[in-house]
Design a protein with these regions (language model features):
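Short, flexible loop/turn motifs enriched in small residues
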Residues: 64-69, 160-166, 326
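RNase H-like nuclease fold core
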Residues: 126-212, 219, 223-224
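Extended amphipathic alpha-helical interaction segments
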Residues: 2-5, 199-214, 221-350
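Short, conserved DNA-binding cores of transcription-related domains
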Residues: 1-87, 340
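C-terminal domain-tail junction helix/linker
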Residues: 22, 297-301, 305-328, 332, ...
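Short, positively charged, Gly/Tyr-enriched micro-motifs
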Residues: 71, 75-162
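Mobile genetic element proteins and their domesticated derivatives, centered on retroelements
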Residues: 100, 113, 154, 174, ...
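Short, hydrophobic/amphipathic alpha-helical patches that form generic packing surfaces
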Residues: 102, 244, 266, 335, ...
């Protein structure tokens, strides 16, 4: 599985204006003045140590793009300052890339992008996969206070080279905050998969511990979060009880299903934990007394026997009682996996691919009607943070991914 620890990423991505950059970068005084202003306005995209000062080091001209890039030194560590209108490794200018990568949100195949925008399919594949190297948490969330207290988690079942694999997924606030690829769905593999989210979150806030996580009840998922965050409250998804009953009885016992479903959602709407528990008990008693078919009775009895897992949400305001948020995002993931015909390479390549997709999902603009409902904030990431660094969604993503999305010191200082 790919590691997302703070690698020797020493590239700071900054929102320089492409119209004035050439004039600015040639003059160290102008460059430093603009850099000082950026440090004051958005210190989170710079290394923590920069508050103690820095010095101008040197510069070089990119052979690929014929553009000058400057470097600075912060406490004996060298950092490259890359303008946000330039892609990582100087592969291209963002103005030539952003429309094509936006279409990847809708899973337009790489060969089609090459047909319309030029280059070749491998070029576009590598661009998307490279995004997967960035910390998802650190790129998506820019302030420790914005880290969510309440999570939703589940595994997407998919295939790699025809063999079954799983994508442990963590979401909150409408954003995908953690994805990994594992070969199994047992305790050990899922704990490793979900630990990526923990590592990235702790880099942003070392004492971070979420209050709740909503799961589908799978034991390995619950064990993974219990081991990673010992103080977390693990909730079970109420929606899964309804789905289990619906899938087994909607056609064969239609009238009874409608009656039970109505009663079930009335229980869900109970305003207190005590009322919720009472309504569930009465519903189960009715089902037993009237001898409901086992496809309906069994899930209801399971709900009653595990009532604590469903009712604890009343003690945590803002927690997720259902997995609706995750289900909506996983629908997009499901389409992505189907359209790409699942994974074809190594486990590491698969993980980079799905992480790159997650970044695009978090930062690419949404439907204009949705944007209007959020006061002009275009993407889930903007809505979570309440702001953006740049009007171009791709430049906003690149600035957010400064230092690879990590604030910790690089492993290799030179």
């Amino acid at each position: 599985m790919a590691k997302t620890s703070p690698r020797n990423n020493r590239t700071i991505c900054t929102p320089f204006c492409n119209k004035t950059y050439v004039d600015t970068v040639e003059c160290p005084q102008k460059f430093r003045a603009q850099l000082d202003d950026m440090i004051a306005r958005c210190p989170e995209i710079f290394p923590l140590e920069i508050q103690h000062g820095y010095r101008m080091k040197d510069s070089y001209v990119s052979i690929r793009l014929n553009i000058r890039i400057r470097r600075i030194e912060v406490e004996n560590t060298n950092f490259t300052i890359r303008p946000s209108f330039v892609m990582p490794y100087q592969t291209a200018f963002t103005k030539d890339i952003d429309n094509a990568l936006f279409l990847r949100k809708f899973d337009i195949p790489f060969w089609a992008l090459a047909h319309v925008f030029g280059r070749n399919a491998s070029f576009w594949y590598r661009l998307e996969s490279h995004l997967g190297r960035f910390s998802i948490v650190g790129t998506t969330i820019k302030e420790p206070a914005k880290l969510p207290a309440h999570l939703v988690a589940d595994e997407k079942h998919t295939k790699i080279r025809g063999k079954k694999c799983y994508i442990p997924t963590t979401v909150a606030e409408g954003c995908i905050l953690g994805v990994a690829v594992t070969e199994k769905a047992d305790n050990a593999d899922l704990e490793r998969g979900y630990s990526t989210f923990k590592q990235e979150a702790l880099d942003l806030k070392p004492k971070y511990s979420p209050k709740t996580v909503n799961t589908d009840g799978w034991a390995a998922t619950k064990n993974a979060f219990g081991n990673l965050f010992p103080s977390i409250c693990i909730l079970s998804c109420f929606l899964h009880i309804y789905i289990k009953i619906r899938d087994r009885s909607k056609k064969k016992h239609r009238e009874l299903f409608i009656e039970v479903a109505t009663a079930l959602w009335e229980c869900f709407q109970a305003t207190t934990r005590r009322s919720f528990s009472q309504k569930i008990r009465r519903l189960v008693e009715t089902a037993q007394y009237e001898s409901y078919p086992d496809v309906i009775l069994a899930p209801l009895k399971k709900l009653k026997s595990n009532i604590v897992d469903y009712s604890m949400a009343y003690k945590h305001r803002g927690s997720h009682r259902t997995s609706n948020m995750l289900d909506r995002l996983m629908q997009g993931m499901d389409r992505h996996m189907y359209n790409t015909r699942y994974f074809h390479g190594s486990l590491e390549a698969a993980e980079q691919n799905i992480r790159g997709w997650a970044h695009i999902k978090n930062f690419a603009p949404q439907n204009p009607k949705t944007v209007k409902q959020h006061a002009g904030l275009k993407s889930p990431s903007e809505q979570l943070n309440g702001r953006r660094y740049h009007d171009c969604w791709l430049q906003n993503l690149l600035i957010s991914s400064s230092l690879g999305g990590f604030r910790g010191a690089p492993l290799n200082p030179k």
